């Protein structure tokens, strides 16, 4: 996950040892997901990030499209605001179309989800599509309760590596 609200939301939905919370790396979640997808081509990789972070790393969409990993999906939780810096309006609230940018970059499958019903229809399908896959998930900017996951980067890294690679990951 990227930083901020997508991390809190992912943790609240259910922590898992294969969740890697990318604290403090604004703009880097999509590229971290690309690296993981290329290194683990038999595993499906889902990056959950926010619109502000995706806007900060737009070049990642072109790089991902050029590499074209079939096992990668990017889900952007888009509230149209920079939630971590005071809720200023983001460019997506001013008409910037992230799914359109992903499509123009060369993503195989792109969508904008405007409702809970459309999200519920998309969720069971994202991992069946050949990637890269991109979804811009429009959500309310209303504050939601925060549940914070572990913030110890070293512990998160080792927990993730062990879940991904097995016990030899600690060596």
Could you say what each language-model-derived stretch is?
Residues 9-10, 84-85, 121-122, 142-147:
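Short active-site-adjacent structural elements
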Residues 9-78:
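Thiamine diphosphate
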């Amino acid at each position: 996950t990227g930083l901020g609200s997508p991390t809190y939301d992912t943790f609240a939905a259910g922590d898992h040892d294969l969740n890697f919370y990318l604290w403090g790396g604004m703009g880097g979640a999509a590229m971290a997901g690309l690296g993981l997808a290329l290194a683990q081509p038999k595993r499906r990789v889902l990056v959950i990030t926010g619109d502000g972070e995706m806007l900060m790393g737009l070049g990642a969409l072109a790089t991902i499209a050029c590499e074209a990993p079939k096992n990668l999906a990017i889900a952007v939780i888009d509230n149209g605001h920079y939630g971590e810096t005071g809720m200023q309006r983001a460019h997506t609230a001013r008409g910037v179309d992230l799914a359109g940018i992903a499509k123009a970059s060369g993503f195989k499958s792109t969508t904008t989800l405007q409702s809970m019903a459309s999200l519920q229809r998309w969720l069971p399908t994202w991992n069946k599509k050949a990637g890269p896959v991109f979804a811009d998930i429009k959500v309310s900017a209303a504050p939601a309760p925060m549940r914070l996951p572990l913030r110890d980067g070293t512990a998160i890294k080792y927990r993730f590596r062990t879940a991904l690679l097995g016990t030899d990951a600690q060596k």
